[in-house]
Structure formats: structure tokens, C-alpha cells
Amino acid sequence: MQPPGAHATPPCADALVNAGLARVVAAMQDPNPDVSGRGLLRLMNAGIGVQCGVLESEARALNKGFLKRMETGQPYIRVKMAMSLDGRTAMASGESQWITGPEARSAVQRLRAQSSVVLTGADTVLADKARLTVRPDELGLNAELTALAAARPPLRVLIDGRLRVPLDAPFFQAGSALVVTCAAASARGRYQEEGHEMLALADSAGHVDLRKLMGELATRGVNEVLVEAGPRLAGAFARLGLVDEFQIFIAGKFLGSSARPLLDLPLAQMSEALELNIVQMRAVGNDWRVIALPVRAPGV
């Protein structure tokens, strides 16, 4: 990407000029409206040859979260789900550990580590005693990358509209978190005392306004959100058209007809089906990993 020309820190463009370079190749122009084009212009004005647009598609793939935030004011939203071959995510009792094997769980740890935010719901936290932390010993990375992941953990965000998760739950004991709710702001003090932040964002139906929440996270500099949630919350993201990417881990087992479905997504007709473009499918240990992108309607 082009060298920035902003002066919050010493700009890279000035460093390149001072280095006496003859030519600079940039994959793409910085989409940040505060700096867009200024770094390249600084180089050209200094007599440095500039070529922009080399391997731009690869650069966009590497920076999809930042690019989406700059271009739309929303983060890149990735929904991770694990299911059986018959499309079930948990037994009727809520038991879900473990559907997939250790290799798939290691891949999920790496997804968490690369994300700005890991977001979940009260149902998941209560049912699984989930912490949603990055577990360094399960990343399967070298020592340097493991240390980097441990030093820069994602922000954990809990959607808990009625504040059902107690403050002594493992999720809260694992570290600070952002709790998004519809409940009265009077409870904020209790959470702040424990090192957590509370944000009240209710929509007209009395639910947490997910679209506004994504905008709020973007204003905080969040590029990528990983949603790890049950069928109700994951289905809400899908219904609102907020999902950019599904990552589905499929285990070679059947959980049966009474087990819980993948998504709470009530549809009556085939024409309502959410179409996906499968861009990758590969084996992960004894499981399969499918990466699929929602097919957007023209103009969306």
C-alpha cells in the first residue's frame, strides 16, 4: 500500500525520500480519505518514480478489514460456525463440546488471533462457559507469532440484552470485555468496577442494534469482527445482511434430528434462501473447513 503522508507519526513518505530511493512500487493507493494519494504525490514531487496498482487484488485480500472500514464505515464481519454433517451445532441440551477435532479448533484460535474483535452472545457464554480468549498453546504457530498473538489479544464483545451473564462467569473472569445491552444504564457502574465497559444500544424492537454496534466498532478502529455465536445471534447477523464471510467447520458425525440447527433463519420459500459462493473447501484434520461469501444482490 502507498506510504502514508499523515503526520501523527513521522510519515513513511519522508523516510523514503530521505533514503534517496529512485523508484517505489505500491500495490494500491491508501483508501483512508485523510491521507489518500498524498504519500505518492510526495514521492513524485521529490523526483522518485512511482508505480501503483501492482498486485492490487492480493493487497486488497490482505487488508480486507481495513479497506471495508475505510470504504463503508463498517468492519469486515466473519461468522464462524461448527456443525455436524447433518447441519447441527449442539445437542438439544445445549451440549456442543466438542463437535470438531483439535486441528479445527486450532484454526479457530488463529482466526481469533487475527481478528480485532471476537463477538459472542449470552446464550453461548452461558451454555458453554465460554471465555472466547486466544489460547496460545493451541495456535500451532512459531514462538515469535505466538508471542505476538498473546501480546495483542482481540477485544471480546458480549451481546447480552438482558444482562443474564453473571459477573463471576468465566467469560468475565478471563479479562476485560465490552458488554452491549438493552438494559438500563444504571448497571454500568457494576461492570466498570470489574474492569468492563457497557454500551446500551437498543433498536425499535427492544433488541441490541447490531448495525449500530458495527458502526460504533468501526469508529473505534476495528477492522475485523469474528462472530462466534449460537444460531439465534448468528442468524440475526445473516438476516440483517451484515455477514461478509462464513467460515464453517464440518465434522464427520451426525447429531440427530433433535439437535440444534446451524442458524435461526426461518424461511418459507426457496426464493428466500441465502445464496453463498463457496471460495474454499479443505480438510482440517478429520474435519472440513468451508469458506463461503454471501452472494449480494446487484447494487448492494
Residues covered by each model-derived region:
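Short capping loops/turns at secondary-structure boundaries
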Residues: 32-36, 52-55, 70-74, 97-101
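Charged/polar, solvent-exposed surface patches and flexible loops
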Residues: 18, 61-68, 106, 110, ...
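Enzymes that bind and transform nitrogen-containing heteroaromatic metabolites
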Residues: 5, 25, 36-41, 76-300
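Proteins enriched for Cys/Gly/acidic motifs involved in redox and nucleic-acid/cofactor modification
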Residues: 40, 54-84
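Zn2+-dependent cytidine deaminase-like catalytic core
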Residues: 1-59, 183-185, 238
